[in-house]
């Protein structure tokens, strides 16, 4: 017999766990977007060396499991440096670096979709390259790559449960700790699954609204 009332005393802890999940996803997405944009520009640059290095980076992070990257960063950072990285920092760093590899490909496609005439027009008008990239190219690249960016954010949110492996007190970690205390594993993980589902549906809804708004502006 299911008994969710056993979990009620632990719901305040769940609120904090959900907040950590959202905060983690937000910072990972921001880091992934910034890194992805830089990588996209490098892969499109005229420097063969930089372009090659960027492609190697993308290949490595897309070709190896995210969980392995997470564990490597968490345990190798203190070993290779004098800095003791926290579990949350290791999670944001590994997810951000991984996400950048995927977002870069989406943004690269978005940049290539921008009409070449705009590049030529900007050069003829003498617009500084950095202003042209940030003010003209980036907004259009985001618009072109928006569906892929929304999907990547959703994947980050779902995959955020992996950080519980290194001890981050996120939503899945909450369920794991509560089932150990109450021995109600099914109820605890059902609640965690429901929370993730609601968060993903909310993010998907916001993404759909944003895509509609962008289409209307066209």
Regions found by a protein language model. Name each.
Residues 1-218:
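Transmembrane alpha-helices and adjacent helix-loop boundaries
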């Amino acid at each position: 017999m299911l008994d969710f009332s056993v979990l009620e005393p632990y719901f305040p802890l769940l609120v904090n766990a959900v907040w950590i999940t959202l905060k983690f996803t937000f910072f990972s997405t921001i880091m992934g977007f910034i890194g992805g944009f830089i990588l996209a520009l490098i892969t499109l640059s005229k420097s063969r060396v930089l372009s090659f290095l960027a492609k190697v980076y993308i290949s490595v992070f897309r070709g190896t499991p995210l969980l392995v990257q997470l564990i490597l960063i968490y345990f190798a950072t203190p070993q290779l440096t004098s800095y003791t990285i926290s579990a949350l920092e290791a999670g944001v760093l590994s997810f951000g670096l991984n996400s950048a590899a995927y977002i870069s490909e989406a943004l690269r496609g978005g940049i290539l979709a921008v009409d070449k005439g705009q590049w030529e027009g900007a050069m003829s008008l003498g617009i500084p390259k950095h202003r042209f990239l940030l003010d003209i190219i980036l907004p259009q690249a985001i618009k072109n790559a928006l569906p892929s960016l929304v999907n990547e954010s959703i994947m980050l949110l779902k995959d955020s449960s992996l950080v519980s492996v290194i001890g981050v007190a996120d939503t899945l970690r909450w369920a794991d700790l509560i089932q150990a205390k109450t021995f109600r594993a099914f109820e605890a993980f059902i609640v965690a699954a429901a929370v993730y589902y609601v968060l993903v549906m909310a993010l998907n809804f916001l993404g759909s609204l944003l895509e509609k708004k962008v289409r209307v502006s066209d």
